[in-house]
């Protein structure tokens, strides 16, 4: 890790320490056990992959370190409803506050406004955050290989499984893929953006997918903003995509999403 990623992890570590003082982990565990029925995040994407269709995880994203403010007055509920109307397979919600201006409130509002499964996109480093995700109603969580050891990743995947949470494990290179595979990851997001430099190249996904096992389902993330990008990536055997900025910036979200899904 280096630069912005190191900074994000440090900030997140401090935030979790503070959160533990406000809400004890035992309280979150109890809340996690009382959450609403789970929606099928991983299964939706597996079906798309098996059928060779096109699945889009539509992201609710207010800002990012690389792009700054994308849409300051974004309404999570309205956004989620439009994503569902446009044909998204699932929704991703950024909940990091310092760097992405998101929150767990955004996730709760989005999930309440639609019937789609919702992914919590966060820099998860601890069991505490997994319990927090389940308590907030998330159906799945993002686990980023770059900020976890293999043991941490394996343990977090196991905890998520025990809580009924699906996991999307994010990688960027061959070493990440090896770590994810050894940890038992089946649904794997290939981030075309290098989290160290924030440079984006959609060829990253088309290159790495050739190393996937037959039981692993790839999801391409970052840099996918057009039908051409999707077709190029599908040609390599990737049928699911996580798309954020281009959807948030679209003048007509529903029409743009339907256009991306048009075969």
From Swiss-Prot:
InterPro entries: Aldolase_TIM (IPR013785), Indole-3-glycerol_P_synth (IPR045186), Indole-3-glycerol_P_synth_dom (IPR013798), Indole-3-GlycerolPSynthase_CS (IPR001468), RibuloseP-bd_barrel (IPR011060). Its EC number is 4.1.1.48. The keyword RNA-binding does not apply. Pathway: Amino-acid biosynthesis; L-tryptophan biosynthesis; L-tryptophan from chorismate: step 4/5. It catalyses: 1-(2-carboxyphenylamino)-1-deoxy-D-ribulose 5-phosphate + H(+) = (1S,2R)-1-C-(indol-3-yl)glycerol 3-phosphate + CO2 + H2O. Keywords: Amino-acid biosynthesis, Aromatic amino acid biosynthesis, Decarboxylase, Lyase, Tryptophan biosynthesis. Pfam families: IGPS. GO terms for biological process: L-tryptophan biosynthetic process. GO terms for molecular function: indole-3-glycerol-phosphate synthase activity; phosphoribosylanthranilate isomerase activity. PANTHER family: INDOLE-3-GLYCEROL-PHOSPHATE SYNTHASE, TRYPTOPHAN BIOSYNTHESIS PROTEIN. NCBIfam families: PRK00278.2-4. Belongs to the TrpC family. This is Indole-3-glycerol phosphate synthase. It comes from Desulfosudis oleivorans (strain DSM 6200 / JCM 39069 / Hxd3). The gene is trpC.
């Amino acid at each position: 890790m280096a630069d912005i990623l190191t900074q994000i992890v440090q900030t997140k570590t401090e935030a979790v320490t503070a959160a533990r003082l406000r809400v004890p982990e035992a309280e979150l565990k109890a809340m996690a056990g009382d959450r609403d029925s789970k929606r099928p995040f991983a299964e939706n994407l597996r079906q798309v992959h098996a059928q060779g269709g096109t699945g889009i995880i539509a992201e609710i994203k207010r800002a990012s370190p690389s792009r700054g403010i994308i849409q300051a007055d974004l309404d999570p509920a309205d956004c989620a409803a439009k994503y569902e109307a446009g044909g998204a397979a699932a929704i991703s919600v950024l909940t990091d506050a310092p760097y992405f201006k998101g929150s767990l409130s955004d996730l709760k509002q989005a999930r309440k406004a639609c019937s789609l499964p919702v992914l919590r996109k966060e820099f998860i480093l601890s069991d505490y955050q997994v319990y927090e995700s389940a308590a907030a109603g998330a159906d799945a969580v993002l686990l980023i290989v770059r900020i976890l050891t293999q043991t941490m990743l394996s343990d977090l995947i196991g905890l998520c499984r025990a809580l009924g949470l699906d996991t999307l494990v994010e990688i960027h290179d061959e070493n990440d893929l090896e770590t994810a595979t050894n940890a038992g990851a089946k649904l794997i997001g290939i981030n075309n953006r290098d989290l160290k430099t924030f440079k984006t190249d959609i060829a990253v996904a088309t290159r790495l997918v050739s190393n996937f096992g037959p039981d692993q389902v790839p999801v391409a993330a970052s840099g996918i903003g057009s039908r051409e990008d999707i077709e190029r990536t599908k040609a390599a055997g990737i049928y699911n995509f996580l798309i954020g900025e281009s959807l948030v910036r679209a003048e007509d979200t529903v029409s743009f999403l339907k256009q991306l899904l048009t075969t």
